[in-house]
């Protein structure tokens, strides 16, 4: 048995030093805005585009990473807009998907739409939320750590992944975009 001091002297003499992980200080900024969960209020959906849910799912295919963001109408479970990216953490998949949804919304400018999402950093970001009121879209968010609040979207994500891998038998990365044509 060797004492701690003796071990320290031996390591110092031999030039052995531990490498510690350096903590990077993050300056506190504005906290993300959390919106109430409007789906829990018994929202009555009587027609299309009244309540749209969104979520992002990630998957690997032949060594490549993909992120797929979907926007789905709760009235008829129709995929209204989607965006696919091969870059991890790409915020533009959310924005491109939202732009597709806004194009549909422009056809019915007076209709108030509820967009229900999780509390992800992009969905709660300032730039994402500044776009919504411009097009008469009300934001609703799931409770933290509760994916069952957005169960319809989570189920569609699981179903799409199962379809991609089990039914389409994808063999190369080029076919992923062809496969997503069937999502529309």
Label the model's feature ranges:
Residues 108-123, 147:
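Acidic/histidine-rich, metal-coordinating catalytic segments
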Residues 83-108:
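Active-site beta-loop-alpha junctions of metal-dependent nucleic acid enzymes
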Residues 7, 11, 39, 55, ...:
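Mobile genetic element proteins and their domesticated derivatives, centered on retroelements
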Residues 45-80, 84-88:
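An active-site-proximal beta-strand-loop segment
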Residues 1-47, 146:
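Basic, flexible linker segments flanking DNA-binding modules
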């Amino acid at each position: 048995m060797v004492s701690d001091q003796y071990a320290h002297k031996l390591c110092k003499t031999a030039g052995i030093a531990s490498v510690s992980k350096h903590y990077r200080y993050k300056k506190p900024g504005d906290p993300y805005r959390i919106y109430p969960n409007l789906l829990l209020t018994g929202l009555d959906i009587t027609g299309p585009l009244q309540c749209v849910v969104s979520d992002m799912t990630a998957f690997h295919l032949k060594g490549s990473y993909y992120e797929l963001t979907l926007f789905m109408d709760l009235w008829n479970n129709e995929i209204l807009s989607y965006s696919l990216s091969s870059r991890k953490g790409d915020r533009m998949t959310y924005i491109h998907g939202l732009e597709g949804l806004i194009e549909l919304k422009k056809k019915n400018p007076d209709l108030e739409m509820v967009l229900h999402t999780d509390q992800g950093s992009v969905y709660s970001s300032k730039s994402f939320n500044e776009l919504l009121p411009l097009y008469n879209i009300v934001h609703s968010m799931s409770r933290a750590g509760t994916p069952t609040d957005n169960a319809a979207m989570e189920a569609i994500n699981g179903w799409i992944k199962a379809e991609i891998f089990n039914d389409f038998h994808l063999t190369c990365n080029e076919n992923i975009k062809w496969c997503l044509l069937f999502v529309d």
